[in-house]
């Protein structure tokens, strides 16, 4: 029996508003526990919620960027459940009239493009956060009432790789709109994954398992990969899949059962009595639509068509708005686009990944990178020397020209000076000359290495090669 994997994702994104969705409480991350909450957030008797218009604008902006249809009439509902981090015993969410529906995004995996549908995007408030210790449980209500959008995909993904690509693309689009920073480590982007298997050709879905507590895109992919194998083994051996909630454990590389679901959750939704229905007219929609900036796909296409970058470079540079904006600022200062792209995708990304930092955390500026690239273009420094300059720029900042002068790193491009060095090296390496003339090409590499060593790596490489061949041919 051949089985097909069905994957759908539910993503919660925290909106970057200055105050909470139904109160004036601040939304700063990392504050002392229970210092950013109010009687409205905690549901004290007699208090009333007031809808944050900016949260609605942000939700519409995200929905439009995800190609959703925007509702003209939308409303809020009470989702009833009891849990210690939910002090009101209900959550204000949206049930049957979400703000956005029927959207899609396009992903690319192994060179193949695929459209993934988005069922709905709705607004809701976040719950508090429970921390469990050996002595008991602690609850921080700072997060209670934070504005969220929940983005529910269609079950259109067929592999864990597609799920990863979907999340990467979704995060990129949301970041470009500016409505959220999408930092998983701070909880501003959270993902639950639903996965089931069915025989190829069957229309009815199999019984799904829900994966929770997935704190990185890599964990989402790994969790789905394991769950795919687990369910396949169970089904092929004649077993049945139970509807379960599971979590991915990185230590064991497995998904672990959290609880078995006997039926669907009954949250007893009913319209929120303290909030009127919301009417969104065309003028409001167009005002929000006009605020949407250039999105990653459009920017990627422009980089290829107008700037002349390879498609791969354009893809990597536009994955995050931060990197893309940095690139644009650098080339606006006069640096060659392809050379700038090479440095960003190579040395810069390698440094950021190793140090677990973002561009805003380092001293390197677009102007600094641009000047360094232009020094390479002019032949003032070689790419090898540039790495020394780069290390200084990204750690401490500064002016590339001043760094080059202070450290004596100017590339030697005077032909007379280099010819003298080349002659001395050749005089001391007669055997290497003979080896090269006898067809051993590696000998030339040895000679170049000796010349670079003698000049402390500051010789102009193309000029060295030219002079070296000229001098060898004279002998």
UniProtKB/Swiss-Prot annotation:
Entry's Gene Ontology BP terms: glutaminyl-tRNAGln biosynthesis via transamidation; translation
EC number: 6.3.5.-
PANTHER family to which the protein is assigned, alphabetical: GLUTAMYL-TRNA GLN AMIDOTRANSFERASE SUBUNIT B MITOCHONDRIAL AND PROKARYOTIC PET112-RELATED, GLUTAMYL-TRNA(GLN) AMIDOTRANSFERASE SUBUNIT B, MITOCHONDRIAL
Family statement: Belongs to the GatB/GatE family. GatB subfamily.
Transmembrane segments: none
Keyword Ligase tagged: yes
Coiled coil: none
PROSITE patterns according to UniProt: GATB
Class of enzymatic activity (EC top level): ligase
Classification via InterPro entries: Asn/Gln-tRNA_amidoTrfase_suB/E, Asn/Gln-tRNA_Trfase_suB/E_cat, Asn/Gln_amidotransferase, Asn/Gln_tRNA_amidoTrase-B-like, GatB, GatB_C_1, GatB_Yqey_C_2, Gln-tRNA_amidoTrfase_suB_CS
Quaternary data: Heterotrimer of A, B and C subunits.
Main function: Allows the formation of correctly charged Asn-tRNA(Asn) or Gln-tRNA(Gln) through the transamidation of misacylated Asp-tRNA(Asn) or Glu-tRNA(Gln) in organisms which lack either or both of asparaginyl-tRNA or glutaminyl-tRNA synthetases. The reaction takes place in the presence of glutamine and ATP through an activated phospho-Asp-tRNA(Asn) or phospho-Glu-tRNA(Gln).
Protein name: Aspartyl/glutamyl-tRNA(Asn/Gln) amidotransferase subunit B
Keyword list, A-Z: ATP-binding, Ligase, Nucleotide-binding, Protein biosynthesis
Organism annotation: Bacillus anthracis
GO molecular function: asparaginyl-tRNA synthase (glutamine-hydrolyzing) activity; ATP binding; glutaminyl-tRNA synthase (glutamine-hydrolyzing) activity
């Amino acid at each position: 029996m051949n089985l097909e994997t069905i994957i759908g994702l539910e993503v919660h994104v925290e909106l970057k508003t200055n105050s909470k969705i139904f109160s004036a409480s601040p939304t700063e991350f990392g504050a002392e526990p229970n210092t950013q909450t109010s009687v409205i957030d905690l549901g004290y008797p007699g208090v009333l919620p007031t809808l944050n218009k900016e949260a609605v604008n942000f939700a519409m902006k995200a929905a439009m960027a995800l190609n959703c249809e925007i509702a003209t009439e939308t409303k809020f509902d009470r989702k009833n459940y009891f849990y210690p981090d939910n002090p009101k015993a209900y959550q204000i969410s949206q049930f049957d009239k979400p703000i956005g529906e029927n959207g899609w995004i396009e992903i690319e995996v192994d060179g193949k493009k695929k459209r993934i549908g988005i069922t709905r995007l709705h607004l809701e408030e976040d719950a508090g956060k429970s921390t469990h210790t050996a002595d008991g449980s602690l609850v921080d209500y700072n997060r209670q009432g934070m504005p969220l959008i929940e983005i529910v995909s269609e079950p259109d993904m067929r592999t864990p790789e597609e799920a990863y690509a979907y999340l990467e693309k979704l995060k990129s689009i949301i970041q470009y709109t500016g409505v959220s920073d999408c930092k998983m480590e701070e909880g501003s982007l959270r993902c639950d994954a639903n996965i089931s298997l069915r025989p190829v050709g069957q229309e009815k879905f199999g019984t799904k398992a829900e994966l929770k507590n997935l704190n990185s895109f890599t964990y989402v992919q790994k969790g789905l990969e394991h769950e795919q194998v687990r369910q396949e083994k169970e089904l092929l051996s004649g077993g049945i899949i139970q509807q379960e909630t599971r979590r991915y454990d990185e230590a064991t590389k497995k998904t672990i059962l959290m609880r078995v679901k006997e039926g669907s959750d009954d949250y007893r939704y009913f319209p929120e009595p303290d909030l009127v229905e919301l009417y969104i007219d065309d003028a409001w929609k167009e005002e929000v639509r006009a605020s949407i900036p250039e999105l990653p796909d459009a920017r990627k296409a422009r980089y290829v068509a107008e700037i002349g970058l390879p498609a791969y470079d354009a893809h990597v540079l536009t994955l995050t708005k931060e990197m893309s904006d940095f690139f644009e600022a650098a080339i606006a200062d006069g640096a060659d686009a392809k050379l700038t792209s090479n440095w960003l995708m190579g040395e810069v990304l390698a440094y950021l990944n190793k140090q677990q930092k973002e561009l805003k955390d380092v001293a390197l500026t677009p102007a600094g990178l641009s000047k360094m690239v232009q020094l390479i273009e002019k032949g003032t420094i070689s790419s090898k020397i540039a790495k020394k300059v780069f290390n200084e720029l990204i750690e401490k900042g500064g002016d590339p020209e001043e760094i080059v002068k202070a450290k004596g790193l100017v590339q030697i491009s005077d032909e007379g000076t280099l010819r003298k060095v080349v002659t001395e090296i050749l005089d001391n390496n007669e055997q290497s000359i003979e080896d090269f003339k006898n067809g051993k090409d590696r000998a030339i590499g040895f000679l170049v290495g000796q010349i670079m060593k003698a000049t402390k790596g500051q010789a102009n490489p193309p000029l060295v090669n030219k002079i070296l061949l000229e001098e060898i041919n004279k002998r």
